Amino acid sequence: MAKLSKQQKKQMYIEKLSSLIQQYSKILIVHVDNVGSNQMASVRKSLRGKATILMGKNTRIRTALKKNLQAVPQIEKLLPLVKLNMGFVFCKDDLSEIRNIILDNKSSSHPARLGVIAPIDVFIPPGPTGMDPSHTSFLESLGISTKIVKGQIEIQEHVHLIKQGEKVTASSATLLRKFNMNPSYGVDVRTVYDDGVIYDAKVLDITDEDILEKFSKGVSNVAALSRATGVITEASYPHVFVEAFKNIVALIIDSDYTFPLMKILKKWVENPEAFAAVAAPASAAKADEPKKEEAKKVEEEEEEEEDGFMGFGMFD
């Protein structure tokens, strides 16, 4: 088979990316700084059948995107994201599931590298370090407060060693190696493209429970505001009905006018002892349940003690 020319390879890449763009509407935009070929192969294997990863030169990616603007106009929003060491993950399955698979393939087997941009803040906790006093001057040069306790260096307070977005310095990398603290390297999912909508990948961390909780709080706030201002809304309907019923009861409790639910309330007001007598057996039964369970436990414990004594006598 003849070797493909540079132009042929470029054309094949553009055709492949064009095909994927038209086929998939959900894309994860990823960055692969400090990711080795073996680790990348592991990610591809884990995503097989669920998603397709495509890396490439940024110029080729832009060329392919621009060629498909007429067929898929919404992909124009991807153009500003084509920068640095990035690529696309074209997703068939749920985006959150794909992202979790990618995160599971992170590796922490390599020490921190000089000049690498820190993706997160790095803190050193206070406490014993296991380092001998000869390292005191090195730690003090980094502005770390220490003291010697039982022949080893102890850090006095939390140390913000590296800030997110900053480059790892030689001193910071050396200190992390001394503490045997290795950073996690892996494919970094940064942005989501969902059928023309672009949003931060952190949105995928939001669960259905989080949404329901926020919605419930919002409804409660609307209901409280509606009650305070006297403006009736759907959120305040339950409260309005309860208040209206209370007003009706207060108005007709001493009159001859009644309705089915009011009859029950009037009977309760006229003869509260009768309702108390009905409620008493039920409450008494509930109160007796813990006592019965406790008595049963005592009996079981006594039986166990007897059995244990008999067993001891047999083998003594």
From Swiss-Prot:
Record's keyword annotation contains Ribonucleoprotein: yes
Species of provenance: Plasmodium falciparum (isolate 7G8)
Name recorded for this polypeptide: Large ribosomal subunit protein uL10
Gene Ontology molecular function terms on file: large ribosomal subunit rRNA binding; structural constituent of ribosome
Keywords: Phosphoprotein, Ribonucleoprotein, Ribosomal protein
Changes after translation: Phosphorylated.
Region spans: Disordered: 282-316
The family this protein is said to belong to: Belongs to the universal ribosomal protein uL10 family.
Function as written in the Swiss-Prot or TrEMBL entry: Ribosomal protein P0 is the functional equivalent of E.coli protein L10.
Summary of subunit composition and partner proteins: P0 forms a pentameric complex by interaction with dimers of P1 and P2.
Listed Basic and acidic residues bias regions: 286-299
Biological-process GO terms, alphabetical: cytoplasmic translation; ribosomal large subunit assembly
One cellular component term from this protein's GO annotations in UniProt: cytosolic large ribosomal subunit
